[in-house]
Protein backbone atom coordinates (compact mmCIF):
# COMPACT_ATOMS: atom_id res chain seq x y z
CA UNK A 1 0.00 0.00 0.00
CA UNK A 2 1.43 3.35 -1.05
CA UNK A 3 1.97 5.77 1.81
CA UNK A 4 0.40 9.22 1.52
CA UNK A 5 2.84 11.95 0.67
CA UNK A 6 3.53 14.51 3.40
CA UNK A 7 2.50 18.08 2.58
CA UNK A 8 5.53 20.14 3.59
CA UNK A 9 3.64 23.44 3.39
CA UNK A 10 2.21 23.24 6.92
CA UNK A 11 5.32 21.97 8.72
CA UNK A 12 7.15 24.44 10.93
CA UNK A 13 10.94 24.34 10.98
CA UNK A 14 11.20 21.66 13.68
CA UNK A 15 8.57 19.46 12.02
CA UNK A 16 10.20 19.66 8.60
CA UNK A 17 13.59 18.85 10.16
CA UNK A 18 12.04 15.81 11.86
CA UNK A 19 10.59 14.71 8.52
CA UNK A 20 13.95 14.98 6.77
CA UNK A 21 15.62 12.95 9.54
CA UNK A 22 12.89 10.30 9.15
CA UNK A 23 13.79 9.86 5.47
CA UNK A 24 17.52 9.73 6.19
CA UNK A 25 18.41 13.30 5.25
CA UNK A 26 20.16 16.10 7.13
CA UNK A 27 18.49 18.98 8.94
CA UNK A 28 20.18 21.64 6.84
CA UNK A 29 18.44 20.27 3.74
CA UNK A 30 15.13 20.70 5.56
CA UNK A 31 15.96 24.34 6.23
CA UNK A 32 16.86 24.82 2.56
CA UNK A 33 13.47 23.47 1.45
CA UNK A 34 11.64 25.45 4.16
CA UNK A 35 13.23 28.64 2.86
CA UNK A 36 12.43 27.79 -0.77
CA UNK A 37 8.76 27.30 0.08
CA UNK A 38 8.12 30.33 2.25
CA UNK A 39 10.84 32.88 1.59
CA UNK A 40 11.06 32.34 -2.17
CA UNK A 41 7.61 30.96 -2.91
CA UNK A 42 8.93 27.93 -4.82
CA UNK A 43 6.88 24.73 -4.62
CA UNK A 44 8.50 22.67 -7.41
CA UNK A 45 11.28 20.46 -6.04
CA UNK A 46 13.05 20.52 -9.41
CA UNK A 47 13.34 24.32 -9.15
CA UNK A 48 15.18 24.10 -5.82
CA UNK A 49 18.58 24.40 -7.43
CA UNK A 50 20.76 23.90 -4.34
CA UNK A 51 19.34 20.42 -3.70
CA UNK A 52 21.03 17.36 -5.16
CA UNK A 53 19.29 15.33 -7.86
CA UNK A 54 18.88 12.27 -5.62
CA UNK A 55 17.30 14.34 -2.84
CA UNK A 56 14.90 15.99 -5.25
CA UNK A 57 13.87 12.56 -6.53
CA UNK A 58 13.33 11.27 -2.99
CA UNK A 59 11.23 14.30 -2.08
CA UNK A 60 9.01 13.80 -5.11
CA UNK A 61 8.40 10.24 -3.95
CA UNK A 62 7.69 11.00 -0.29
CA UNK A 63 6.49 14.60 -0.09
CA UNK A 64 4.50 17.28 -1.83
CA UNK A 65 3.86 21.00 -1.51
CA UNK A 66 0.17 21.54 -2.11
CA UNK A 67 -1.33 25.02 -2.32
CA UNK A 68 -5.14 25.35 -2.16
CA UNK A 69 -6.86 26.71 -5.25
CA UNK A 70 -7.96 30.35 -5.31
CA UNK A 71 -11.58 30.30 -6.49
CA UNK A 72 -11.62 34.04 -7.05
CA UNK A 73 -10.04 37.23 -5.80
CA UNK A 74 -11.23 40.82 -5.61
CA UNK A 75 -9.50 44.16 -5.13
CA UNK A 76 -11.23 47.15 -3.56
CA UNK A 77 -10.76 50.75 -4.56
CA UNK A 78 -9.16 51.40 -1.14
CA UNK A 79 -6.42 48.78 -1.67
CA UNK A 80 -8.16 45.97 0.19
CA UNK A 81 -7.79 42.51 -1.39
CA UNK A 82 -9.96 39.47 -0.75
CA UNK A 83 -9.43 35.84 -1.74
CA UNK A 84 -11.92 32.96 -1.67
CA UNK A 85 -9.84 29.82 -1.21
CA UNK A 86 -10.98 26.26 -1.93
CA UNK A 87 -10.30 23.89 0.96
CA UNK A 88 -11.64 20.62 -0.35
CA UNK A 89 -15.19 21.46 -1.38
CA UNK A 90 -15.63 24.25 1.14
CA UNK A 91 -14.22 27.75 1.07
CA UNK A 92 -12.59 30.24 3.41
CA UNK A 93 -11.88 33.90 2.91
CA UNK A 94 -8.69 35.86 3.45
CA UNK A 95 -8.52 39.65 3.43
CA UNK A 96 -5.59 42.05 3.04
CA UNK A 97 -6.15 45.54 4.45
CA UNK A 98 -3.89 48.37 3.31
CA UNK A 99 -3.27 51.23 5.72
CA UNK A 100 -0.61 53.90 5.90
CA UNK A 101 2.64 52.25 6.90
CA UNK A 102 1.26 48.74 7.25
CA UNK A 103 -0.43 45.91 5.40
CA UNK A 104 -2.53 43.57 7.52
CA UNK A 105 -3.64 40.11 6.45
CA UNK A 106 -6.77 38.74 8.13
CA UNK A 107 -6.45 34.93 8.22
CA UNK A 108 -9.17 32.30 8.73
CA UNK A 109 -8.73 29.30 11.02
CA UNK A 110 -11.92 27.27 10.51
CA UNK A 111 -14.55 26.58 7.87
CA UNK A 112 -17.42 28.28 9.62
CA UNK A 113 -17.35 28.64 13.40
CA UNK A 114 -18.56 26.69 16.43
CA UNK A 115 -19.27 29.66 18.69
CA UNK A 116 -22.32 31.20 16.99
CA UNK A 117 -21.97 34.75 18.33
CA UNK A 118 -25.35 36.33 17.70
CA UNK A 119 -24.11 39.27 15.64
CA UNK A 120 -21.48 37.48 13.51
CA UNK A 121 -22.24 36.53 9.93
CA UNK A 122 -19.65 33.73 9.90
CA UNK A 123 -21.43 31.97 12.74
CA UNK A 124 -24.60 31.75 10.65
CA UNK A 125 -22.79 29.29 8.36
CA UNK A 126 -22.53 26.71 11.10
CA UNK A 127 -19.32 24.75 11.55
CA UNK A 128 -17.73 22.44 8.98
CA UNK A 129 -14.19 21.67 10.16
CA UNK A 130 -10.86 23.01 11.35
CA UNK A 131 -8.31 24.09 8.78
CA UNK A 132 -5.02 22.21 8.66
CA UNK A 133 -1.79 24.06 9.41
CA UNK A 134 -1.07 23.95 5.66
CA UNK A 135 -4.44 25.57 4.88
CA UNK A 136 -3.80 28.31 7.45
CA UNK A 137 -0.29 29.20 6.26
CA UNK A 138 -1.37 28.86 2.62
CA UNK A 139 -3.42 32.03 3.06
CA UNK A 140 -0.24 34.00 3.78
CA UNK A 141 1.68 32.17 1.02
CA UNK A 142 -1.02 33.06 -1.53
CA UNK A 143 -1.30 36.67 -0.38
CA UNK A 144 2.47 37.22 -0.38
CA UNK A 145 2.83 35.80 -3.89
CA UNK A 146 -0.20 37.65 -5.28
CA UNK A 147 0.57 41.02 -3.75
CA UNK A 148 4.18 40.94 -4.94
CA UNK A 149 2.85 40.94 -8.51
CA UNK A 150 0.58 43.93 -7.99
CA UNK A 151 1.49 47.19 -9.73
CA UNK A 152 3.91 49.51 -7.99
CA UNK A 153 1.49 52.28 -7.03
CA UNK A 154 1.20 50.99 -3.45
CA UNK A 155 3.33 48.94 -1.08
CA UNK A 156 1.32 45.75 -0.67
CA UNK A 157 3.77 44.03 1.69
CA UNK A 158 2.19 41.96 4.48
CA UNK A 159 3.59 43.50 7.67
CA UNK A 160 1.00 42.24 10.17
CA UNK A 161 -1.12 39.14 10.62
CA UNK A 162 -4.42 39.02 12.49
CA UNK A 163 -6.02 35.66 13.18
CA UNK A 164 -9.44 37.29 12.96
CA UNK A 165 -10.94 35.69 9.87
CA UNK A 166 -13.50 32.89 9.80
CA UNK A 167 -13.49 30.71 12.90
CA UNK A 168 -12.22 30.73 16.48
CA UNK A 169 -8.45 30.14 16.27
CA UNK A 170 -8.12 28.79 19.81
CA UNK A 171 -10.59 26.03 18.92
CA UNK A 172 -8.03 24.94 16.30
CA UNK A 173 -4.98 25.37 18.51
CA UNK A 174 -3.00 22.36 17.21
CA UNK A 175 -2.97 23.71 13.65
CA UNK A 176 -2.94 27.47 14.24
CA UNK A 177 0.16 27.49 16.47
CA UNK A 178 2.45 25.69 13.96
CA UNK A 179 1.18 28.00 11.22
CA UNK A 180 2.02 31.05 13.34
CA UNK A 181 5.46 29.53 14.03
CA UNK A 182 6.06 29.62 10.27
CA UNK A 183 4.84 33.21 10.04
CA UNK A 184 7.42 34.25 12.64
CA UNK A 185 10.34 32.15 11.38
CA UNK A 186 13.22 34.18 9.94
CA UNK A 187 13.67 31.57 7.21
CA UNK A 188 10.04 32.12 6.20
CA UNK A 189 8.12 35.39 6.67
CA UNK A 190 10.10 36.81 9.59
CA UNK A 191 7.28 38.55 11.44
CA UNK A 192 7.76 39.36 15.13
CA UNK A 193 5.40 38.23 17.90
CA UNK A 194 4.23 41.82 18.15
CA UNK A 195 3.12 41.73 14.50
CA UNK A 196 1.08 38.53 14.76
CA UNK A 197 -2.19 38.92 16.66
CA UNK A 198 -4.59 36.16 17.60
CA UNK A 199 -8.16 37.17 18.33
CA UNK A 200 -10.29 34.98 20.57
CA UNK A 201 -13.84 35.11 21.85
CA UNK A 202 -12.58 33.76 25.15
CA UNK A 203 -11.46 30.12 25.15
CA UNK A 204 -9.80 30.69 28.51
CA UNK A 205 -7.70 27.51 28.99
CA UNK A 206 -6.18 27.95 25.56
CA UNK A 207 -5.18 31.55 26.35
CA UNK A 208 -2.81 30.15 28.98
CA UNK A 209 -1.56 27.55 26.48
CA UNK A 210 -1.00 30.27 23.89
CA UNK A 211 1.10 32.31 26.30
CA UNK A 212 3.27 29.28 27.05
CA UNK A 213 3.64 27.90 23.53
CA UNK A 214 3.57 30.95 21.26
CA UNK A 215 3.21 34.30 23.00
CA UNK A 216 1.89 36.23 20.03
CA UNK A 217 -0.12 39.40 20.57
CA UNK A 218 -3.60 38.81 21.99
CA UNK A 219 -6.90 40.44 21.14
CA UNK A 220 -10.15 39.52 22.89
CA UNK A 221 -13.63 39.85 21.41
CA UNK A 222 -15.39 41.24 24.47
CA UNK A 223 -18.43 43.04 23.01
CA UNK A 224 -20.25 43.44 26.34
CA UNK A 225 -19.50 44.93 29.78
CA UNK A 226 -21.32 42.27 31.85
CA UNK A 227 -22.04 38.56 31.89
CA UNK A 228 -25.77 38.90 31.33
CA UNK A 229 -25.39 40.63 27.96
CA UNK A 230 -22.29 38.67 26.95
CA UNK A 231 -24.06 35.37 27.62
CA UNK A 232 -26.64 36.46 25.07
CA UNK A 233 -24.38 37.71 22.27
CA UNK A 234 -21.18 35.66 22.89
CA UNK A 235 -22.45 32.25 24.09
CA UNK A 236 -19.02 30.89 25.08
CA UNK A 237 -19.28 33.31 28.02
CA UNK A 238 -21.63 30.78 29.65
CA UNK A 239 -18.65 28.41 29.86
CA UNK A 240 -15.88 30.93 30.59
CA UNK A 241 -17.28 34.09 32.17
CA UNK A 242 -15.83 37.58 32.13
CA UNK A 243 -14.02 37.19 35.47
CA UNK A 244 -12.19 34.07 34.22
CA UNK A 245 -11.44 35.72 30.90
CA UNK A 246 -10.01 38.90 32.41
CA UNK A 247 -7.88 36.93 34.87
CA UNK A 248 -6.24 35.18 31.91
CA UNK A 249 -5.87 38.50 30.09
CA UNK A 250 -4.17 40.11 33.08
CA UNK A 251 -1.49 37.40 33.14
CA UNK A 252 -1.08 37.57 29.36
CA UNK A 253 -0.51 41.32 29.53
CA UNK A 254 2.19 40.81 32.16
CA UNK A 255 4.11 38.19 30.17
CA UNK A 256 3.12 38.71 26.52
CA UNK A 257 4.79 40.84 23.83
CA UNK A 258 2.65 43.89 24.62
CA UNK A 259 1.92 45.30 28.04
CA UNK A 260 -1.77 45.55 27.23
CA UNK A 261 -4.60 43.50 25.76
CA UNK A 262 -6.64 44.75 22.83
CA UNK A 263 -10.35 44.36 23.51
CA UNK A 264 -12.63 44.35 20.48
CA UNK A 265 -16.08 45.74 21.05
CA UNK A 266 -18.64 45.60 18.25
CA UNK A 267 -21.06 48.49 18.70
CA UNK A 268 -24.72 47.64 18.03
CA UNK A 269 -27.39 50.28 18.34
CA UNK A 270 -29.34 50.14 21.61
CA UNK A 271 -27.73 46.80 22.47
CA UNK A 272 -24.31 47.68 23.89
CA UNK A 273 -23.64 51.25 22.74
CA UNK A 274 -25.40 53.21 25.48
CA UNK A 275 -23.46 55.55 27.75
CA UNK A 276 -24.33 53.26 30.65
CA UNK A 277 -22.57 50.42 28.78
CA UNK A 278 -19.46 52.58 28.40
CA UNK A 279 -19.54 53.42 32.10
CA UNK A 280 -19.86 49.74 33.00
CA UNK A 281 -17.02 48.80 30.63
CA UNK A 282 -14.69 51.36 32.22
CA UNK A 283 -15.57 50.16 35.72
CA UNK A 284 -15.04 46.54 34.70
CA UNK A 285 -11.58 46.98 33.19
CA UNK A 286 -10.38 49.29 35.95
CA UNK A 287 -11.58 47.00 38.73
CA UNK A 288 -9.80 44.00 37.19
CA UNK A 289 -6.63 46.05 36.58
CA UNK A 290 -6.24 44.77 33.03
CA UNK A 291 -4.07 47.08 30.87
CA UNK A 292 -6.40 47.62 27.93
CA UNK A 293 -6.59 49.14 24.51
CA UNK A 294 -10.11 49.20 23.10
CA UNK A 295 -10.96 48.78 19.43
CA UNK A 296 -14.54 49.79 18.68
CA UNK A 297 -16.06 48.09 15.64
CA UNK A 298 -19.26 49.63 14.24
CA UNK A 299 -21.58 46.76 13.36
CA UNK A 300 -21.79 45.83 9.68
CA UNK A 301 -25.38 44.78 8.88
CA UNK A 302 -26.03 41.65 6.82
CA UNK A 303 -29.27 40.09 5.52
CA UNK A 304 -31.55 38.83 8.27
CA UNK A 305 -29.72 40.36 11.23
CA UNK A 306 -31.78 42.13 13.90
CA UNK A 307 -28.86 44.42 14.81
CA UNK A 308 -28.16 47.90 13.50
CA UNK A 309 -25.08 50.06 13.13
CA UNK A 310 -25.11 52.98 15.58
CA UNK A 311 -25.10 56.55 14.37
CA UNK A 312 -21.79 58.37 14.16
CA UNK A 313 -22.85 60.49 17.14
CA UNK A 314 -23.40 57.42 19.31
CA UNK A 315 -20.08 55.91 18.22
CA UNK A 316 -18.27 59.18 18.95
CA UNK A 317 -19.93 59.52 22.38
CA UNK A 318 -18.90 56.00 23.37
CA UNK A 319 -15.33 56.55 22.20
CA UNK A 320 -15.03 59.93 23.93
CA UNK A 321 -16.16 58.50 27.25
CA UNK A 322 -13.58 55.70 27.12
CA UNK A 323 -10.80 58.11 26.16
CA UNK A 324 -11.80 60.56 28.90
CA UNK A 325 -11.38 57.71 31.38
CA UNK A 326 -7.85 56.96 30.26
CA UNK A 327 -8.28 54.16 27.72
CA UNK A 328 -6.56 54.27 24.35
CA UNK A 329 -9.54 53.81 22.04
CA UNK A 330 -9.77 53.45 18.28
CA UNK A 331 -12.70 53.06 15.92
CA UNK A 332 -12.08 50.54 13.19
CA UNK A 333 -12.49 52.11 9.79
CA UNK A 334 -14.68 50.26 7.33
CA UNK A 335 -12.51 48.98 4.50
CA UNK A 336 -13.27 46.74 1.56
CA UNK A 337 -17.03 47.00 2.03
CA UNK A 338 -17.46 47.30 -1.76
CA UNK A 339 -16.12 43.72 -2.03
CA UNK A 340 -17.83 42.34 1.13
CA UNK A 341 -14.48 42.27 2.95
CA UNK A 342 -15.30 44.60 5.82
CA UNK A 343 -15.25 43.20 9.34
CA UNK A 344 -18.28 40.99 9.87
CA UNK A 345 -18.88 40.32 6.19
CA UNK A 346 -16.56 37.34 5.80
CA UNK A 347 -19.46 34.96 5.25
CA UNK A 348 -20.64 36.91 2.22
CA UNK A 349 -24.40 36.78 1.73
CA UNK A 350 -25.87 34.91 4.68
CA UNK A 351 -27.99 32.11 3.22
CA UNK A 352 -28.89 28.59 4.28
CA UNK A 353 -26.17 25.97 3.97
CA UNK A 354 -27.63 24.29 0.87
CA UNK A 355 -27.79 27.49 -1.16
CA UNK A 356 -24.38 28.57 0.05
CA UNK A 357 -22.87 25.25 -1.03
CA UNK A 358 -24.56 25.47 -4.43
CA UNK A 359 -23.35 29.04 -4.90
CA UNK A 360 -19.79 28.05 -4.05
CA UNK A 361 -19.80 25.02 -6.36
CA UNK A 362 -21.17 27.17 -9.18
CA UNK A 363 -18.38 29.70 -8.65
CA UNK A 364 -15.81 26.89 -8.63
CA UNK A 365 -17.31 25.42 -11.80
CA UNK A 366 -17.32 28.78 -13.54
CA UNK A 367 -13.68 29.29 -12.60
CA UNK A 368 -12.64 25.87 -13.90
CA UNK A 369 -14.47 26.50 -17.16
CA UNK A 370 -12.56 29.72 -17.83
Swiss-Prot record:
Report disulfide bridges, numbered on this chain: 106-343
**Pfam families the record matches:** Radical_SAM (PF04055), RlmN_N (PF21016)
Q: What does the cofactor field's note say?
A: Binds 1 [4Fe-4S] cluster. The cluster is coordinated with 3 cysteines and an exchangeable S-adenosyl-L-methionine.
Q: What class of enzyme is it?
A: transferase
Any GO MF annotation of the entry:
tRNA (adenine(37)-C2)-methyltransferase activity
Provide the active-site residues from the annotation.
93 (proton acceptor), 343 (s-methylcysteine intermediate)
Residues binding [4Fe-4S] cluster: 113, 117, 120
The EC code for this enzyme is 2.1.1.192
- Catalytic reactions on record: adenosine(2503) in 23S rRNA + 2 reduced [2Fe-2S]-[ferredoxin] + 2 S-adenosyl-L-methionine = 2-methyladenosine(2503) in 23S rRNA + 5'-deoxyadenosine + L-methionine + 2 oxidized [2Fe-2S]-[ferredoxin] + S-adenosyl-L-homocysteine; adenosine(37) in tRNA + 2 reduced [2Fe-2S]-[ferredoxin] + 2 S-adenosyl-L-methionine = 2-methyladenosine(37) in tRNA + 5'-deoxyadenosine + L-methionine + 2 oxidized [2Fe-2S]-[ferredoxin] + S-adenosyl-L-homocysteine
Give the keywords, sorted. 4Fe-4S, Cytoplasm, Disulfide bond, Iron, Iron-sulfur, Metal-binding, Methyltransferase, rRNA processing, S-adenosyl-L-methionine, Transferase, tRNA processing
The family database entries (InterPro entries) matched by this protein are listed as: Aldolase_TIM (IPR013785), Elp3/MiaA/NifB-like_rSAM (IPR006638), Methyltransferase_A (IPR040072), RlmN_N (IPR048641), RNA_MTrfase_RlmN (IPR027492), rRNA_lsu_MTrfase_RlmN/Cfr (IPR004383), rSAM (IPR007197)
| Cofactors, names only | [4Fe-4S] cluster
Q: Where is the Radical SAM core domain?
A: 99-337
Superkingdom in the source lineage: Bacteria
User: Binding residues for S-adenosyl-L-methionine, per the UniProt record?
Assistant: 167-168, 199, 221-223, 300
- Function of this protein? Specifically methylates position 2 of adenine 2503 in 23S rRNA and position 2 of adenine 37 in tRNAs. m2A2503 modification seems to play a crucial role in the proofreading step occurring at the peptidyl transferase center and thus would serve to optimize ribosomal fidelity.
The miscellaneous annotation reads: Reaction proceeds by a ping-pong mechanism involving intermediate methylation of a conserved cysteine residue.
**UniProt similarity note:** Belongs to the radical SAM superfamily. RlmN family.
Q: What is this protein called?
A: Dual-specificity RNA methyltransferase RlmN
Provide the gene name from the record.
Answer: rlmN
